[in-house]
Design a protein with these regions (language model features):
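Conserved P-loop NTPase motor cores
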Residues: 1-127, 166-173
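Conserved P-loop NTPase motor module
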Residues: 108-176
Length: 176
């Protein structure tokens, strides 16, 4: 039944007027149970019909297990926004650590050279060197051990990828 509903939604999206329709949001929980092989084209094409597709899964390994690793990578690339909560498997954490990007940092090294005071002209020289280092923004361990209700989020705004950052869930009080 879930696949039928998803195929019906896909059909409805493709009937929309490209680039001029209002935005529509499709949310699919536990989506590995409902997807089908051509789903990868749907997530790419849905953008021009202004359909936003949000999916949730326990692990991306479900995709690789069912359809293969390349299919999984194709889907992950097609989904432009990514949100990862803690307590994921180390395998998923490694994958998302790479997907969420890298950052450059610079390490300073200092050296000193001293000419013995017993020489005619004792001298002390010091210098600094800088080395560029590229590292993942969030290591697998930082992804796994995030604070409760904290998520690593990477989004695209106006076709520009925004670097990953960690956000805290802001729940609506029960009184509301």
């Amino acid at each position: 039944l879930g696949k039928f509903v998803l195929l019906s939604l896909q059909n409805a999206v493709y009937r929309r007027t490209p680039l001029t329709s209002t935005f529509a949001h499709i949310i699919i929980d536990e989506f590995p149970d409902y997807i089908y092989l051509p789903f990868k084209e749907f997530i790419s094409q849905a953008r021009k019909y202004k359909a936003i597709i949000t999916v949730a899964a326990q692990t991306v390994a479900q995709l690789a297990d069912k359809y293969g690793e390349m299919y999984m990578h194709t889907l992950l690339t097609g989904f432009r926004h990514k949100m990862v909560y803690g307590d994921i498997s180390y395998c998923d954490a490694q994958l998302f650590s790479k997907l969420l990007g890298e950052e450059d940092s610079y390490e300073e090294g200092k050296n000193e050279q001293t000419v013995s005071p017993l020489q005619e002209e004792p001298v002390m020289r010091s210098g600094s060197s800088y080395q560029q280092k590229t590292d993942v923004i969030l290591t697998p361990n930082k992804l796994i051990f995030q604070e409760p209700f904290q998520a690593a989020v990477k989004i695209v705004v106006n076709n520009k990828p925004i670097p990953v950052r960690q956000i805290d869930a802001n729940f609506v009080p029960k009184a509301e």
